[in-house]
Amino acid sequence: MILKENQLDNTLIMAKKILIMGLPGSGKTTIAKLLVPMFNAVWLNADKVREEVNDWDFSPTGRTRQADRMKNYAQKALDDNRNVIADFVCPTEQTRADFGADYIIWMDTIKEGRFEDTNKMFEPPKKYDF
């Protein structure tokens, strides 16, 4: 296949899964709104996903379940060769590993969120890209 100048075959590019994570109120959704059109991405907002499945369990088990759910939703988009941007707290190394992002954007903009239980369990990421 020969590509003409300024022509790109999207089948040659692997779709990516981008996680925007941080404490509640750190600006995750604000950044996601800006990046989604730039990357022509499917947007997974954790609050909207929780609302859709009516699962408001924020215990460690509930958060693991949410990370797995977000991973499964993202995989459906990746299977269609669509980029994915997911914005959610993803408070522990384990939930971040469960989600399995290609890139992590840490919104390190606040030191405490509005939910004390989340503040207590939040682990700053050891690895992030931006």
Task: Identify the residue ranges that each predicted region occupies.
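Small-molecule kinase domains that catalyze NTP-dependent phosphoryl transfer to phosphate-bearing small molecules
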Residues: 97-98, 107-130
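P-loop (Walker A) phosphate-binding loop of NTP-binding proteins
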Residues: 23
